[in-house]
């Protein structure tokens, strides 16, 4: 490690990733979070929100394809899509790749961060915000859902993890919130979400989210992928009342990719299916999990990766 | 990061993992490598050889199950097994779990390191070195293979990556070496190996190994898994002249796990199969790779992750 | 910074010194503190107690000569000497260099640490513990002084700084403690002490100690020296009721060094004198300081270097 | 150490100072050096050139008073002053505090860096560049001196250390360069200079500079001070053919400070004098030094702090 500028990210309480910064593009503090955007040699631009890397220029396609397309492809004809969070605009970009989409609403609480992304992160949004089908709402996702009567075919949840007892995102990880999402799904609708890192010493993040979503939806399926720029395996999930998302056949997915003319760089139909096959230790952790996060007793993750429940005192 | 002792591991040339050390159990220098063994809170004991983490107490089962069982399970009745490298003894331990095994020879060049493992790492070997079926040979694997007339049903290669132009392991990554291994396989035999990290900025490590093995064997299949303690995805491969290792049916694997009464913590038959399904970007990297590592022009990996070829000047 | 083992020491809350460890010689936890002893290339062995470097093999002579000889040389004939703290034995070693000394009592609370020093740090004590004039007492210095009726010509205080509200050393930094020391001085006696780092952002440590000692003694003189292995300037002071320690003439000191045949590596009579000349900003900080640390309201230093007073709840 | 941005500065080859950056104000690369300017909590703005901290907002007054006033005060009436280097403008600011000064020429090779300082570092220059007595020349100092016929009463040399064999500053550390400086001194003139860190493991930097200057000037006197923001002791020196700079009486300095109405924050006349009193180990290192840096065989400092001589291949 030569002299110069570095970013410290605490991947676990005991392991820290030190990333060399070639250049700091922007850094600051919105009303909701600290942000840092810098140039790195290995990953291009790197966006950090609060304590954790959010995405990197060179591998964001892996994260965003993994987040978006399983939900979009298990739905036969997603026309109206809601994105909860997703400030950089790349989730929106991937959603809009599906020609079936007529309207994509993105609700993010942090308008200032969205401006940073618009100005400094064109590699992410690639003009998606200007697509006539895109609607950007700057608001708390929960408040938005309580207000709107709109219904969606697909809802994509792209939030940061509820790390820390004072994290306001905790109320977006409760049964009540997932029921609110479900109430805004059209018949046959599906919810896809980023569902926490999967790490030996942090195993309960994903299991608790999975267990909680299960309270709200009939069918819940976890899947995972390795995100290089995070240096971690990440968990995702699909939830639906209409059908079991794991029951899709590879042939159907293959056909939809072709029909919708999707240009994918990471996913294939077989790989999409394989992501849903989980190793034994993770399956066991999912099975034995009993914690359900509720509005009254929402869960949060300690820096040590433990899941705890306590009332949220905004 | 509190005051105290830390270990710096350069995961890439631009990203360094800083691991908190609770206690240093042993550190030193054998004729072949530096070693560090320390206690960490998240992963238990951590073994570092030269620059890179080798395995950690708490997740070594993931690495060793992933390395050993695909090869052992695709073979109908592995009786004689050769392990190249594998100093800690956990590869040996996993091999010996198969009741079909009559003799397991482990050849490691670094006798001093094996002694460190025997004394300080019982969680890894769990007495495997004392199994009457185990034979430990302290020697250069290549010299051993050139000398011996023994034939094996399965050969497991568990070496460190050939990072650096002066790395003597380079001569264990050539077509000639793989042919030498093949020459010591019984009919129907299979080779399994650790085959390099899979990382955006280091993509060519695994592709070059894959491409090179393909010169020596009729059937070569890559697979991958995330190793939490490495904070990376790692590549592995199976090679055989007798059969396509990816053509096994899930049912057969399932049956063999049951018949051999294997106690596995991470692998299941479906997950084992899913590890062989690779994402599009990696498939493309494998396809377009043309570099073949030879004795005359063995490849090595630069710290930047580039693959280069140059004669080895021991 | 190559791969390997490092020690993190937080020199300030915003600046951390990362020291490369070639080898960890010993580390552990006594009932009173964490200790780390390691080999470094630049400074030889380095001893860390809790959060801070205590001394290093290659420059400990600078620290210990600076701490011990001003007090010993301003006294015309130091026969009986008390050392408060000083676990490594080098303070004792320097005291015993004065042939006038008949008895040197060292009181350190941490017997386990003294054992570590005896076994692993011979470069420090150089056999001082075996000198027939040396008496080692393992006890709390305050309890010892309350118990003993002995009187001393010189008392050397060699303690760690009272960083942190729960630091038991706080009660060894109060007016009452300094009065207790004074009560054990023979007529004409002098107290010398390590009195905290002198750093822009930590200015109040030394001023508060200075101001507090002034409550107990008629004459108090601060001096300072740069300790390379600490990467800091450190403050020291002499206190006496009998004479002004800054009033010594260079000639007298020169003569005493010669008479006592002192082999010094860092100090000379002129340099000893020059250490008492302080820069303007430090003089102003000493003058304007008003905080007096008392048993009822002992001071402590926050990690930010602020001095605060609060009752000590052992 | 919380998550966030840090700067790594290698104080020695084995010790690295990690400084927390609150905000990066500017960073870039001029034709001559890398620069980083950031905000820190403990020291305010911090300027790094290439590998090392250059000065910090909160303690630059210590460095610049130490560099400038000994030379200026030992001269009875400095009217014309030359500054070699000194990009930030604070050396110029201190020089201009002396009302005797009629013209102060600052020659710095790096015009781009001077622009950065003008725009982002007003706390340093405080408008000094706009003083009608100030003349800024962007040029190599050696070329400038070879060209000009001007003579000066005081020359202040404020350069970075010649670390690294390819460092162009090496030719500003030779006997020939010092003779060139001398040739531009008026009768009775004096040269003052920053003369390298003084550190146990880097002892030869200052001794070699001292020894080399001694070849060019009749009287050479080293002095030192601790620079908090560098976490090091730094060496300086005065050189003159006219008089011994260490022979000034405290009273004369005191009187000149008063007459010139100098507002000093760190220096006093006694402290100025005390800085010239060196400890025994440093005196011995100066005495035994034999290396003389010449144009044919200029010295440089290795990262390990060793002094070496070799022809410079620009």
Curated annotation (Swiss-Prot), chains A, B, C, D:
Where is the catalytic site? 158 (proton acceptor)
Q: What is its EC number?
A: 2.5.1.104, 2.5.1.126, 2.5.1.79, 2.5.1.22
**Cellular component terms (Gene Ontology):** cytoplasm
UniProt keyword terms in alphabetical order: Cytoplasm, Polyamine biosynthesis, Transferase
The UniProt catalytic activity note for this protein reads: S-adenosyl 3-(methylsulfanyl)propylamine + agmatine = N(1)-(3-aminopropyl)agmatine + S-methyl-5'-thioadenosine + H(+); norspermidine + S-adenosyl 3-(methylsulfanyl)propylamine = norspermine + S-methyl-5'-thioadenosine + H(+); S-adenosyl 3-(methylsulfanyl)propylamine + spermidine = thermospermine + S-methyl-5'-thioadenosine + H(+); S-adenosyl 3-(methylsulfanyl)propylamine + spermidine = spermine + S-methyl-5'-thioadenosine + H(+)
Please describe what happens when the gene is knocked out.
Cells lacking both speB and speE genes show defective growth at 70 degrees Celsius and significantly defective growth at 78 degrees Celsius. They accumulate agmatine and N1-aminopropylagmatine.
The pH profile of the activity is: Optimum pH is 8.5 at 60 degrees Celsius.
Q: Which residues form the PABS domain?
A: 4-241
A single MF term (Gene Ontology): spermine synthase activity
Binding annotation for S-methyl-5'-thioadenosine? 33, 108, 140-141, 168
Enumerate the transmembrane spans. Answer: none
Compartmental location:
Cytoplasm
Q: Where does spermidine bind?
A: 64, 88, 158-161
Q: Which PROSITE patterns match?
A: PABS_1 (PS01330), PABS_2 (PS51006)
Keyword Calcium assigned? no
**Which InterPro entries does this one have?**
PABS, PABS_CS, SAM-dependent_MTases_sf, Spermi_synthase, Spermidine_synt_N, Spermidine_synt_N_sf
Keyword Hydrolase attached: no
Describe the temperature profile of activity: Optimum temperature is above 80 degrees Celsius.
- GO biological process entries: polyamine biosynthetic process; spermidine biosynthetic process
The record's annotation in PANTHER family points to: THERMOSPERMINE SYNTHASE ACAULIS5
What's in the misc comment field? In T.thermophilus, the biosynthetic pathways of spermidine operates via N1-aminopropylagmatine without the production of putrescine.
Q: What does this protein do?
A: Involved in the biosynthesis of polyamines which are thought to support the growth of thermophilic microorganisms under high-temperature conditions. It seems that long-chain and branched-chain of polyamines effectively stabilize DNA and RNA, respectively. Catalyzes the irreversible transfer of a propylamine group from the amino donor S-adenosylmethioninamine (decarboxy-AdoMet) to agmatine to yield N1-aminopropylagmatine. An efficient aminopropyltransferase activity has been also observed with norspermidine which produces thermine, and spermidine which produces spermine and thermospermine.
Instruction: Give the record's subunit note.
Output: Homotetramer.
**Similarity field:** Belongs to the spermidine/spermine synthase family.
Protein name in the entry: Polyamine aminopropyltransferase
Which gene carries the instructions for this protein?
speE
């Amino acid at each position: 490690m030569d002299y110069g500028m570095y970013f410290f990210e605490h991947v676990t309480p005991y392991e820290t990733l030190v990333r060399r910064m070639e250049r700091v593009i922007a850094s600051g503090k919105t009303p909701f979070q600290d942000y840092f955007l810098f140039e790195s040699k290995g990953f291009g631009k790197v966006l950090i929100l609060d304590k954790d890397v959010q995405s990197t220029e060179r591998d964001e396609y892996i994260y965003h394809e993994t987040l978006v397309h399983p939900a979009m492809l298990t739905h036969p004809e997603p026309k109206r899509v809601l994105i909860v969070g997703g400030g950089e605009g790349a989730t929106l970009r991937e959603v809009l790749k599906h020609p079936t989409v007529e309207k994509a609403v993105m609700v993010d609480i942090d308008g200032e961060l969205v401006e940073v992304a618009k100005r400094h992160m064109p590699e992410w949004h690639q003009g998606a915000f200007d697509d006539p089908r895109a609607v950007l709402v700057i608001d708390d996702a929960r408040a938005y859902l309580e207000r709107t009567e709109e219904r969606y075919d697909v809802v994509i949840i792209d939030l940061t993890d509820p790390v820390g007892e004072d994290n306001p995102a905790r109320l977006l990880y409760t049964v009540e919130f997932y029921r609110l999402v479900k109430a805004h799904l059209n018949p046959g609708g599906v919810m896809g979400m980023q569902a926490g890192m999967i790490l030996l010493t942090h195993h309960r993040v994903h299991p608790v989210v999975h267990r909680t979503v299960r309270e709200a939806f009939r069918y819940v399926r976890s899947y995972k992928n390795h995100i290089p720029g995070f240096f971690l395996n990440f968990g995702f999930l699909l939830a639906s009342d209409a059908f079991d998302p794991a029951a899709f056949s590879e042939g159907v997915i293959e056909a939809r990719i072709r029909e919708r003319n999707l240009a994918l760089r990471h996913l294939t139909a077989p790989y999409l299916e394989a992501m849903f096959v989980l190793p034994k230790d993770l399956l066991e952790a999912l099975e034995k999990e009993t914690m359900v996060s509720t509005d009254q007793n929402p869960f949060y993750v300690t820096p040590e990766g433990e899941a705890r429940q306590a009332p949220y005192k905004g």
